[in-house]
């Protein structure tokens, strides 16, 4: 069982941070200044700079990710954007990338093939999703069947057809 949030942590964050660190360095910030802006250690920025942190190609090549990196990099470097705004802008993009069929949904389906087998659209966080309703019904039917299997004498009531 792997949560979509794990996809964000394992695939998006290292990729996004390394792209943003590179953007900020290109704008003239020192490694320490980049570390301060990103809220990470200077050592982490050094790893981003030397390519020691793997990037997810699907995330790195997404135009929306690239646009956000450029916008946030420019805003943070110039002081026109606060760290809070950068965080919120990034969170908004993360939610968009979780949409059915989008980047995180595809990565999540690759890690949890059972999700790919489901033919409808769904949002993992939607408490009213069709997928969740279907899985709850499946579980309920399973509990009912198990209860019937263990009910004494029930088998004699079922006709042989």
Regions found by a protein language model. Give the residues of each.
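DNA major-groove recognition helix of helix-turn-helix
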Residues: 25, 38, 49
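Short alpha-helical "recognition helix" segments of helix-turn-helix
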Residues: 31-36
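Short, amphipathic alpha-helical "recognition" segments used to contact nucleic acids or chromatin
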Residues: 13-28
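Short, solvent-exposed alpha-helical "recognition" segments
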Residues: 15, 48-63
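Short, basic, alpha-helical segments at the C-terminal edge of helix-turn-helix-like DNA-binding modules
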Residues: 62-71
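Short, Lys/Arg-enriched anionic-surface-contact patches
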Residues: 1-17
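Helix-turn-helix/homeodomain-like alpha-helical modules used for DNA recognition
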Residues: 70-160
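Key DNA-contacting residues within the recognition helix of helix-turn-helix
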Residues: 42, 46-47
